[in-house]
């Protein structure tokens, strides 16, 4: 009674601590499917009808850039501009917005404006970037929804560079804001700057691309604060590579970014207050309040080092390399106690940020010296020292790549400053250069495909393999381009290379015959034909299950060439596991349980939990994956709800198969006769209470037609995931 009366009349939603234990607290190993339901319209104040691309077209970009240029030198007392110019601050803001990108899973990056939210807004490496965004607020307020925060952060970095005399490579809008934090795996650590992500001989766990929790890349003082430039170079090379940058791009980015501005280590970090998320309500989201002196300007503390790189920190120059090679360096410490380096026996040539009468000797970060003392970096750095124009071009291109890497193909780019040049990292797909097939052609092609002798399983598997590489994170992959016929995808184990080659050979023959027979310039690409063939197979399977349905198909895909494909970059898209195909690699290290990998892939495919559920059930009965397990039907290649019916049959008792990790045997509960074998991914739909609820819907007697319709809708969503031209 006491317990009941204590809670009577209280709101059931916990708003403040202390709070009751959540399900995850009670069952920490429970599979989290809520990641599939984030960023819904329920959290979007602009509503489902808002079209950012249309709003961006109304933007007066020239006027916006004029306002941004004016802001650069409009120093505010509450956060004064170093050297009278905010350029360095805004370059860091843009860099750190984009720099969370990681090629392994395509997550992070500037594409959603996540720097506004926790945890990124409170990472130690993002200290005082809250001030940069507050400086931008009057401009964002003025231009409203015509410029997203995500675009504004990057555009401001570009304008900062241009205002200081640098010619940028271009700018593309098109980043759409989200309205809640992205709950990503940023590392296993429970403390800022922890480094539990390493194992063995400094092996950085995937998919992580930073050396410590709360850093963008590396520790500027050196690995774990050890001021060793050569050891730091190893960290730099690995973290930048995981952001898809090669050595030349890495050197250009570090040197180019460190041509401007300064770091801030005026005093002991103990003077710094709470980060934005941990601050008092009256702080209004401004964090890192410092009680050292004035706390701002000459007294600012952002990190540890106190370094200015150039004699002209508000103008583009080659001073970074000139100073790097023209001096010898000795280890010292900043006023904050951080390791840094100063030029030996050097004149004081570096201006003070706030006192024009003062000069300082040149200083460097440990990671700056890596560009001189690592042999590969040193060779590139000397070339840039001797060829300033080459350095400027390399930095312009690397900066554009840094800030646009997660935007996907150029068809998503908006605005008048989009560069005309195609870049291989954009995963170029040729423009449509022929008439597209019509409904009559489509019907004829379907008939030829079905009559070709290829099975439902072969056609569905090939279409799924082609389309399911899509990543909603960085908009890479997908069926457009037909890169499944090229290295490395054609050789991936998950794609069953021998079967894939046979299917593609037949489809290419159908394509050749059709295209050769046309007299009006009409053609079909292999990319389109692969998707059409998968749809035709699904229709055949539905008919075998007693349902007539048409799988939607929109032509317009094109075939990319080998020259347009960076094979090494596409290697990152190879799945270690694909629960939709019941595949787990036995030769590559696994970082997740198979069912977790399924949810992870579903999230990359932008699927909801019900969509994931219906796709797994359909793909199993169509035998689209591992043929031995999970095919819970006596009618394979017929699109039925048998997977769910048989999984939930209480007449079946499941037990692990000895010697086969993650594989289970289902036997008749009464007779002990073997019925099925399944994997963890199969059984999770009966074990996990929420997924079981979805499975029950599709196992119902009245759900057969709904199952087919829902499968076709989810299938079509995946097939069209990369069709940005249809949006």
Curated annotation (Swiss-Prot):
- Where is heme b bound in this sequence? 258
Does the keyword Heme feature in the UniProt annotation? Answer: yes
Family annotation (Pfam families): peroxidase (PF00141)
Q: How is the cofactor bound?
A: Binds 1 heme b (iron(II)-protoporphyrin IX) group per dimer.
Query: What keywords were assigned to this record?
Result: Heme, Hydrogen peroxide, Iron, Metal-binding, Oxidoreductase, Peroxidase, Plasmid
* Record note on modification: Formation of the three residue Trp-Tyr-Met cross-link is important for the catalase, but not the peroxidase activity of the enzyme.
GO annotations of cellular component type: cytosol
Q: What is this protein called?
A: Catalase-peroxidase
